[in-house]
Amino acid sequence: MGVLGSRVAWAWLVQLLLLQQLAGASHVVYDDLELQAAAATADGVPPSIVDSELRTGYHFQPPKNWINDPNAPMYYKGWYHLFYQYNPKGAVWGNIVWAHSVSRDLINWVALKPAIEPSIRADKYGCWSGSATMMADGTPVIMYTGVNRPDVNYQVQNVALPRNGSDPLLREWVKPGHNPVIVPEGGINATQFRDPTTAWRGADGHWRLLVGSLAGQSRGVAYVYRSRDFRRWTRAAQPLHSAPTGMWECPDFYPVTADGRREGVDTSSAVVDAAASARVKYVLKNSLDLRRYDYYTVGTYDRKAERYVPDDPAGDEHHIRYDYGNFYASKTFYDPAKRRRILWGWANESDTAADDVAKGWAGIQAIPRKVWLDPSGKQLLQWPIEEVERLRGKWPVILKDRVVKPGEHVEVTGLQTAQADVEVSFEVGSLEAAERLDPAMAYDAQRLCSARGADARGGVGPFGLWVLASAGLEEKTAVFFRVFRPAARGGGAGKPVVLMCTDPTKSSRNPNMYQPTFAGFVDTDITNGKISLRSLIDRSVVESFGAGGKACILSRVYPSLAIGKNARLYVFNNGKAEIKVSQLTAWEMKKPVMMNGA
């Protein structure tokens, strides 16, 4: 880092410590409401079967209570801001406010007082998700959904402004008297009308944003609204896009470079600058309320018609996902400090609500990810932000050129693995043993993984990692690949099909845990036999990135044996083909100095 870098780091660390003292009371626990929530959840709630040591070490999390959607992430005057849906009174959903945390590095966080709470007629019964937009003068504006009726979730869109734009911490927000600024008129379903996006400014001087909705019984819709002043908004004649997927929550719409660069693009600049517009594609992401996952398409934005057209006509059917695991309500933002786009996503617990109440916390945010367009132009790539590497221990454990024979597993020793970062490069000896893919499962990775889990012997694979494993392997979470020959279609030969799967079905001996397999197909060419995997392990989180970020899976697991020093890490191969570990590098991960006062 150097002397100057060290001094700068210490300077902002001192700032954060002072802020933490000022913000010490920002997360207040109301024990009486937690008791009420517990009583409503179960009769006589016992102590949680989730061990306290399974609380995450380096993922974003407040000290107590419930969190869900990340809201309005931004970079402002040297500080990263994250707002998020938060219940200050308990570990179940309810009493939602916009909690607010700030950071210099996206790793160490200090919680400030809530930024937005129910306080006006337009949000008296709920302050739900929304986004931030940087105005022309660099000042942020927040648009968010309010609920304004007690009898029904009648949803309107409101605006909030910083009281003092010169405050880099944006500690106070005000709601103008003209709220709500957007209401569900013209036949819009008022109970399914929420989560405004970051706005973008067109060459005509109008700001535009999207609001997610449901048309009829099953059509997800992204309505376009226009405004010159962020006060008076007009709905466009046609939606930006729609598809028969069910309700679209938390829409996100942003440009990505299409010329091979990994740089992010500011949401507005790509529209105003015609030259830049020619070098970008657009991403439309929606969170599916019924299925509880996020999917996206890559396509073209027609600014004159105000329509978005996916490059793949079947994109809304095939559902490319940010993450094939426990990851929802995501939101991106452009980081001008490092010219990158960063993705946040919420990961809920997989235990019971009664356990959440008993242990006193529920929900985390995934590690922030840098996202950019794959050179193929067909999908995004995702990778943990570089800052997370600062938490790595000084001395990694390295395993090189180790052949793992069929049916063999190899323990990785020399470090504690309950909180670790593992990168591994595999080489498959031969693809000849690959099984033929069942045509019935050609588009259903989840079903395929459930049927052919980590312990089901195969041809090429399953091979990968057993993480958070107990010494006797009674508990283990498997993250693995399996390679298939393509399903026969007219006798033609295609490239091998790669399945990535996380199998937590043996992750815990505790009962009543939600332990589904998660899986996705990896759009990669493995004909050279090479593929990589990275897993961030954090006590009760396994967050994995396959083939350089082409497929991602986050899973929540709650071992009863593989906890702390008792957690083990293995490389395994349950296929017929030999697998070589070209290189495995594993680091113990430290805790951040500050995590919202926890």
Swiss-Prot record:
Recorded catalytic reaction(s): these are: Hydrolysis of terminal non-reducing beta-D-fructofuranoside residues in beta-D-fructofuranosides
Quote the EC number.
Answer: 3.2.1.26
UniProt KW keywords: Apoplast, Cell wall, Glycoprotein, Glycosidase, Hydrolase, Secreted, Signal
Residues in the active site? 69
Per UniProt, subcellular location reads as: Secreted, Extracellular space, Apoplast; Secreted, Cell wall
Provide the Gene Ontology terms for cellular component. Answer: apoplast
Q: What class of enzyme is it?
A: hydrolase
So which residues are the signal peptide here? 1-25
Listed SUPFAM superfamilies: Arabinanase/levansucrase/invertase, Concanavalin A-like lectins/glucanases
Please give one Pfam family short name. Answer: Glyco_hydro_32C
Q: Note the CDD domains from the entry.
A: GH32_Fruct1-like (cd18624)
Which GO BP terms apply?
carbohydrate metabolic process
| Protein role | May play a role in sucrose partitioning during seed development.
Query: Which family is this protein grouped under?
Result: Belongs to the glycosyl hydrolase 32 family.
Q: This protein is called what?
A: Beta-fructofuranosidase, insoluble isoenzyme 2
Which gene holds the coding sequence for this protein?
CIN2
